[in-house]
Amino acid sequence: MASHKTFRIKRFLAKKQKQNRPIPQWIQMKTGNKIMYNSKRRHWRRTKLGL
């Protein structure tokens, strides 16, 4: 990744960074909840973004 990024790329990376987190604990605690973990987690070494 170049150190000089366009704003579009930077915005794209920022969004992916925000998406890449576990689900909040209070969501796990909700009644009738079936979501136990974030299935769309991405590891920087295993799965690349395809830029």
Curated annotation (Swiss-Prot):
Changes seen on gene knockout: Defective sperm formation, resulting in substantially reduced male fertility. Male mice show smaller testis sizes, lower testis/body weight ratio, increased ratios of abnormal sperm head and tail and severe subfertility with significantly fewer cumulative live pups born compared with wild-type mice. The sperm count, motility and progressive motility are reduced. Female mice display normal fertility.
Domain of life, source organism: Eukaryota
Key words of the record: Cytoplasm, Ribonucleoprotein, Ribosomal protein
GO cellular component: cytosolic large ribosomal subunit
Main localization (coarse): cytoplasm
GO BP of this protein: cytoplasmic translation; spermatogenesis
Cellular localization per UniProt: Cytoplasm
Organs and tissues of expression: Highly expressed in spermatocytes and spermatids. Highly expressed in embryonic stem cells.
InterPro entries given in the database record: Ribosomal_eL39, Ribosomal_eL39_CS, Ribosomal_eL39_dom_sf
Gene3D superfamilies (alphabetical): Ribosomal protein L39e
GO MF term set: structural constituent of ribosome
Matching PANTHER family: RIBOSOMAL PROTEIN EL39-LIKE 2, RIBOSOMAL PROTEIN L39E
Record's subunit section: Component of a male germ cell-specific 60S large ribosomal subunit (LSU), which contains RPL10L and RPL39L, instead of RPL10 and RPL39 paralogs. The composition of the rest of the complex is similar to classical ribosomes.
Family: Belongs to the eukaryotic ribosomal protein eL39 family.
Role description: Male germ cell-specific component of the ribosome, which is required for the formation of sperm and male fertility. Replaces the RPL39 paralog in the ribosome of male germ cells. The ribosome is a large ribonucleoprotein complex responsible for the synthesis of proteins in the cell. The male germ cell-specific ribosome displays a ribosomal polypeptide exit tunnel of distinct size and charge states compared with the classical ribosome. It is responsible for regulating the biosynthesis and folding of a subset of male germ-cell-specific proteins that are essential for the formation of sperm.
The protein, known as: Large ribosomal subunit protein eL39-like
Species: Mus musculus (Mouse)
Gene: Rpl39l
